[in-house]
Amino acid sequence: VKIYNRANPLTPWKMMGRMHDKYLIADGKNYILGGRNTYNYFLGDFPGHKNYDRDVLVICDEPRKENSVNQLLDYFETIWEQEDSGDFHNDKKLANRKSVKKAVLELQEGYQQYFNENKGMIFDTDYTDETFETEKIALVSNPIHTASKEPVVWYQLGELMKSAKNRVKIHTPYIICNDMMYNTWEEIAENVPNFSIMTNSVANNGNPFGSADYAKNRNKILNTGIDIWEYEGGYSYHGKSILIDDDLSVIGSFNMDMRSTYLDTELILVIRSKEINKQLEEGMMEYEKVSRQALEDGTYHDPYHVKPIELTKKRQRNVFLVQHLLGWARYLF
């Protein structure tokens, strides 16, 4: 196990550089990539709080050098070997500690319990009938150093969206933009007839910083010309996806915020396939049918007859406090 950019009080200027990539590679030829974190309310059917998310499964039976799986393997090795990645622990004697032995036993017992309860769902799968052949898959990433980054992913996404002929549809859990990002959206809105974004409503957002910033800047976002749909599904939506026309799909870890743009490592897949685009649209629309369109006068267009989540007094107070006490640091959220 290695740690990317371990926190060090002697180098506080590096502490904001985080690894935000989420992917899993199996056998050097198949992988899952998306926006899902690896704790309970992102995985499985655990009780309590949940987050809805999205990943893409890529199967490469005979990966060639230029395939995306090899690009991803190279990316992993680059981060693994870079100077800001260090061993979590590298002392073999730690295995003799009681606490470590206890943790090992808990993992073994937990795995056995999981296997016994779910063995009916664990089997080899032929994905031929469940996947689509693609024309091309491109992996796009931010720089991997821990300092402020050039907005590589944002720039490439912007160029792709500006080239759209008919539509761009974005899903993101948070919107925390600066003027450069707003300007990009204005350019897209001027050239693309159907340009929309879905994000969590203020009441439905699991991130208090995202709620506070969106509540303050909603009209500024609308002034770019983009249509905003607010998700009201009860559980916070964490998916990050983009549809461009009817043949390009984007799935990954990138949020529409300044942290993803300038601070974090990020990975997205750009997939050229009409079948994938259609499948992704169907999945995205399941959530949009539980959303309302925000209008500039503060009212809503509600074609799906959605009951909004109640904005509680506690949430209103939290939004107010974040806006007035921490708004100056919005680029860090």
Predicted segments, located by residue:
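Charged, low-complexity intrinsically disordered terminal segments
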Residues: V1-D21, A26-F333
